[in-house]
């Protein structure tokens, strides 16, 4: 069956139901839950505090029950221990807002297409490849933020008004079956949600597609985070190579979809950091920050100082980048750095101390002006074979060698518009592969970053890194310190600078020499190909979503950083990737874990050989013939008996 939300059957009490008993909740929610759980005495509510949380895991689904492999499956639970010594078990479940392609309320009495695509003039982009035209919609929802505003004005909300910002990375195929990857401008939507004041249940009231035309549209929006100042920080990964744009058919297709002209889009307008501001009426606005480096932006994590941003770079021969804004809560100007990996271990995912190279200081406005006017040939000369000219420098770039030479006076343009190449030239360690999500454990001053796959660039030394794997990736911990200097000896104006990097032992994948009985090529009881990661301060839990080419089903995990226990919480449909992860400790007294998936049934001929025949018809029935995907969240159901 499909995962359409059914409000009439919804009996959610809340996600992680113990959390409203925290002092942050108070009020009717805490009282109602104490009564429901047998407490009975409302006056006792403020004295009862959540002390600890542990999760109970679920087994990975198998072909013994194919239906569970073909949908989002949750068989996990939570035990909450309170200050009165009592422990309460809760089961977890998954609830959707919609399956993309559904008509959803537009807030004006009508409906609109969820996940729908629009051109630069906000006209629907139509798929004319099938027997009848239809508007394109995405099967790849990704980064999600949950937030609230002080004075919302959306009509029709009976409880608390909560907003979610959801971005859609790409669409896999048109009706004919041809790949559409990267050939459509990524949409972003603001969802207005009605939060039940007693149970915390969320109901979709309004869907609004954000106008991104002022930012020249968006390119392959992947992970996202919520800023400390309550905005949605988006992403644009796999920036188009401006030096080879004339032969880039993907970018030409993108330009044609966006502008109706295959040559109009400017590659230097993409690969930046978009920021979405939500308005009280449930609409939103978009601007791009051009001063944070033009890289394969997967996700940025802003530190508690509200100035320092650590950035995931989902690339081959990518780097670890840090941006320090000139002003708090303002990413429109600042200083860009790249890390140098000083290796201390090759085993178990490797380890290193980190040095920081300053690439430059700039404002978004000045780099935008350069992007508007410059071509690649104005900034640098690039060769893909050795020119036998000493004025060129060999660097690693996207899995191969480039020989580059910066044009006189173009260092700043190169630093912010050709960031990968310039960072390599400056001595940055450009050997990372598939650096994905980034998050922060504020109490311990530890950042975490996910390396989804340890590829050849991390093992062959081409980018200054030479470790032994495992190929299915790992989550790394980075200690954050004050008082650091860059490689030029200048003080770095931040107390949140990563000084070292090492894989977390419990979050190191395990490659299998021989596939298991289901076809997994990495141990299914360990994290493999980690992608989305988010840390919950109150739960002391690092949530990890997989983008795995080694697990038949991808999983969402919870890792307690104090007890070092890893627990499987959720399984996505086979062939799908776990996306949209966002852990929210307190939204009007309730906690939530947002979770989407994308491209269900994206079959690999080898990985899914044993399951495809059985699961493909089930997934097609569940998810609009594989054109749809779920946007939703993990919920908690109290066990009252």
Residue ranges and their predicted role:
Residues 38-40:
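Bacterial signal peptide processing site
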């Amino acid at each position: 069956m499909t995962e359409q939300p059914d409000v009439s059957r919804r009996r959610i009490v809340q996600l992680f139901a113990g959390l409203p008993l925290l002092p942050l909740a108070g009020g009717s929610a805490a009282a109602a839950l104490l009564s429901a759980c047998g407490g009975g005495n409302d006056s006792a509510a403020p004295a009862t505090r959540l002390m600890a949380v542990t999760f109970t895991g679920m087994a990975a689904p198998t072909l013994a029950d194919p239906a569970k492999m073909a949908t989002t499956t949750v068989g996990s639970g939570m035990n909450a221990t309170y200050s009165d010594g009592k422990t309460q078990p809760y089961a977890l479940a998954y609830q959707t807002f919609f399956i993309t392609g559904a008509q959803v309320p537009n807030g004006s009495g009508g409906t609109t297409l969820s996940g729908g695509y629009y051109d630069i003039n906000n006209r629907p982009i139509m798929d004319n490849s099938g027997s009848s035209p239809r508007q394109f919609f995405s099967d790849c929802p990704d980064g999600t933020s949950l937030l609230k505003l002080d004075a919302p004005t959306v009509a029709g909300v009976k409880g608390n008004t909560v907003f979610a910002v959801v971005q859609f990375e790409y669409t896999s195929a048109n009706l004919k079956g041809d790949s559409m990857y990267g050939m459509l401008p990524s949409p972003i939507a603001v969802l207005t949600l009605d939060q039940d004041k007693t149970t915390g249940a969320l109901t979709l009231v309004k869907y609004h597609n954000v106008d991104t035309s002022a930012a020249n549209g968006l390119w392959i929006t992947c992970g996202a985070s919520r800023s400390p100042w309550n905005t949605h920080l988006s992403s644009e990964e796999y920036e188009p190579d401006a030096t080879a744009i004339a032969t880039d058919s993907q970018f030409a297709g993108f330009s044609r979809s966006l502008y109706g002209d295959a040559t109009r889009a400017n590659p230097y307008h993409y690969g930046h950091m978009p920021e979405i501001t939500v308005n009280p009426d449930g609409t939103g606005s978009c601007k791009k920050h051009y001063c944070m480096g033009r890289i394969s932006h997967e996700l940025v994590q802003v530190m508690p100082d509200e100035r320092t941003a650590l950035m995931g770079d989902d690339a081959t021969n990518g780097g670890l980048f840090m941006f320090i804004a000139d002003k708090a809560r303002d990413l429109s100007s600042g200083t860009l750095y790249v890390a140098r990996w000083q290796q201390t271990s090759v085993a178990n995912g490797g380890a290193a101390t980190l040095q920081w190279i300053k690439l430059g200081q700039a404002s978004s406005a000045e780099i935008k002006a350069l992007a508007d006017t410059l071509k690649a040939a104005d900034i640098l000369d690039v060769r893909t074979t050795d020119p036998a000219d000493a004025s060129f420098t060999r660097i690693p770039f996207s899995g191969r060698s480039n020989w580059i030479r910066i044009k006189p006076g173009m260092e700043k343009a190169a630093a912010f518009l050709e960031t990968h190449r310039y960072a390599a030239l400056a001595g940055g360690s450009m050997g990372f592969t598939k650096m994905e999500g980034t998050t922060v454990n504020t109490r311990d001053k530890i950042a975490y970053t996910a390396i989804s796959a340890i590829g050849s660039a991390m093992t062959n030394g081409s980018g200054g890194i030479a470790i032994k794997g495992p190929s299915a990736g790992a989550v790394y911990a980075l200690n954050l310190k004050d008082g650091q200097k860059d490689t030029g000896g200048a003080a770095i104006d931040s107390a949140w600078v990563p000084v070292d990097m090492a894989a977390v032992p419990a979050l190191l994948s395990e490659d299998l020499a021989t596939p298991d009985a289901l076809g997994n090529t990495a141990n299914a009881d360990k994290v493999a190909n980690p992608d989305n990661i988010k840390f919950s301060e109150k739960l002391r839990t690092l949530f990890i979503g997989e983008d795995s080419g080694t697990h038949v089903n991808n999983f969402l995990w919870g890792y307690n950083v104090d007890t070092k226990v890893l627990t499987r919480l959720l399984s996505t449909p086979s062939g799908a990737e776990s996306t949209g992860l966002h852990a929210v400790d307190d939204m009007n007294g309730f906690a939530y874990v947002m979770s989407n998936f994308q491209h269900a049934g994206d079959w690999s001929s080898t990985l899914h050989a044993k399951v495809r025949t059985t699961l493909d018809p089930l997934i097609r029935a569940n998810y609009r013939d594989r054109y749809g995907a779920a946007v939703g969240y993990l919920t908690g159901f109290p066990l009252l008996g």
